[in-house]
Amino acid sequence: MNTGIIDLFDNHVDSIPTILPHQLATLDYLVRTIIDENRSVLLFHIMGSGKTIIALLFALVASRFKKVYILVPNINILKIFNYNMGVAMNLFNDEFIAENIFIHSTTSFYSLNYNDNVINYNGLSRYNNSIFIVDEAHNIFGNNTGELMTVIKNKNKIPFLLLSGSPITNTPNTLGHIIDLMSEETIDFGEIISRGKKVIQTLLNERGVNVLKDLLKGRISYYEMPDKDLPTIRYHGRKFLDTRVVYCHMSKLQERDYMITRRQLCYHEMFDKNMYNVSTAVLGQLNLMNNLDTLFQEQDKELYPNLKINNGVLYGEELVTLNISSKFKYFINRIQTLNGKHFIYFSNSTYGGLVIKYIMLSNGYSEYNGSQGTNPHMINGKPKTFAIVTSKMKSSLEDLLDVYNSPENDDGSQLMFLFSSNIMSESYTLKEVRHIWFMTIPDTFSQYNQILGRSIRKFSYADISEPVNVYLLAAVYSDFNDEVTSLNDYTQDELINVLPFDIKKLLYLKFKTKETNRIYSILQEMSETYSLPPHPSIVKVLLGELVRQFFYNNSRIKYNDSKLLKMVTSVIKNKEDARNYIDDIVNGHFFVSNKVFDKSLLYKYENDIITVPFRLSYEPFVWGVNFRKEYNVVSSP
């Protein structure tokens, strides 16, 4: 990134509509590398650092020269990009060609380019002389989208901007695909990746490191938000390697059915969702049922003496005593004394969603816009509520998040508990979350970080002095109290195989994390910085941000104010051109946010430049006026 741009800002105000200095510095790098040099870039910015706005600002710049295609994972993230495109346009302060920008979900892009599951090669010519931006790029490989991207790269010879806060998902294989997509050479995966008998033994070898450094030199942008902008994370539980884990000791009932399930899987449990299930909660005959829909139709079927299922509804005293789930027993007991909002991750949405709903209802927590809990717990005179987010409810997710993130819900009085499966692991932002729970051990280090990154990010907290609490729950045997202090103690399969499922998963996660961190450090070292005058294509965008910052602190100045002129000439060296620019923003009534008057427009008054506050007024009973670009104005073919 261009550190010369960062040096132009002093005490940047982040609390107003703004482009952050590192975003502008990265934008400069993207324009030089992708547009000027026609080279692909991996935007490896850690979650919460604003990759989306950077990508959209770049798309606006690039639209003046080429067509830009933006691919996002699903329809909900498409809505987020559409909204943020409006935000980016409002901050852009320069010309762009909206008709040259197309935003697709991967599903719609597949439909556009496949006929009967066969690529329509004749239609690919539309992508000549274009640029592709791919969000969550680590997820496109191993499916039709990844295949299509490779074909377009080879046929159209175009550059890609790949966005990822975690370019390695499970193994270095993902990184190998990224290298292949970004470079002009075809990669032989057998030469760069060494494979053992287990997934954790998949490593980027020395040849792979050299290929990585050679082919991606000058193509990596790495950035991590400084800790000073984020709240402290407080991990709970006992020390487990370099983190903390809450050991949830199973009851005799749970341990018995847990072991039955495990024995039936004959040590293949790492790859079976039933082990996820019984580590969360045991449900008797449901434990090994793959067709849960059939069992959900049973009427008054007894699972345990104190637990039955009737037409998909669980009921019985066991939902309160919670011998079926050591994790939920800990969770229910702990939340009674906690204040603030909770975000709870779990996997296997059908089984997990069933367990969560009826445990929460039975213990006095009410379903948001649904059933009321037994003897409901209250906050500010209203029931404490929960919602369960799975892929089956995508249509209502946006509205639900609006409620959860609203300032009125900072204390959780509208919606306190948000349970989510993998659908929430990427691209969404949660605000003012004070407690993050892992009911399921994530499969990968990137998934773990993505879940944390939904909440722990810049602008998500009004008060960063208050810590965020993280609870990583592991179901363990009733007599299990092992201290896990070193990975070297668990190099033999015999030692690992006797461990509880969750502890095995944690160890595998840490083994894979070791390799992931090694590669990430290489990528970080490859990220280049330079100090140059801003690229001509972003000068107006940069000046717009400098002006916003200046007039935040200045309500009224002389027209020939030396500080304003000095600021503008730091970018436009010619003083006459700088004065002309000042004339343009004043006569054009540039929009700023002022610390005294809030939303304001610049005006000339006698020999002064003043900030004039404004507000939008309307007659009663007006149906609707679209004052903001809330929706995407960019069309799609």
Curated annotation (Swiss-Prot):
Q: Which UniProt keywords apply?
A: Activator, ATP-binding, DNA-binding, Helicase, Hydrolase, Late protein, Nucleotide-binding, Transcription, Transcription regulation, Virion
Tell me where on the tree of life, at the top rank, the source sits.
Viruses
E.C. designation(s): 3.6.4.-
Q: Where is the Helicase C-terminal domain?
A: 327-507
Positions contributing to ATP binding:
H45, I46, M47, G48, S49, G50, K51, T52
Q: Which PROSITE patterns match?
A: DEAH_ATP_HELICASE, HELICASE_ATP_BIND_1, HELICASE_CTER
Uppermost EC category:
hydrolase
Subunit text: Heterodimer of a 70 kDa and a 82 kDa subunit. Part of the early transcription complex composed of ETF, RAP94/OPG109, and the DNA-directed RNA polymerase.
The task this protein performs is described as: Acts with RNA polymerase to initiate transcription from early gene promoters. Is recruited by the RPO-associated protein of 94 kDa RAP94/OPG109 to form the early transcription complex, which also contains the core RNA polymerase. ETF heterodimer binds to early gene promoters.
The family annotation for this protein states:
Belongs to the helicase family. VETF subfamily.
What name goes with this protein? Early transcription factor 70 kDa subunit
Q: Lineage, please?
A: Viruses, Varidnaviria, Bamfordvirae, Nucleocytoviricota, Pokkesviricetes
The encoding gene: OPG118
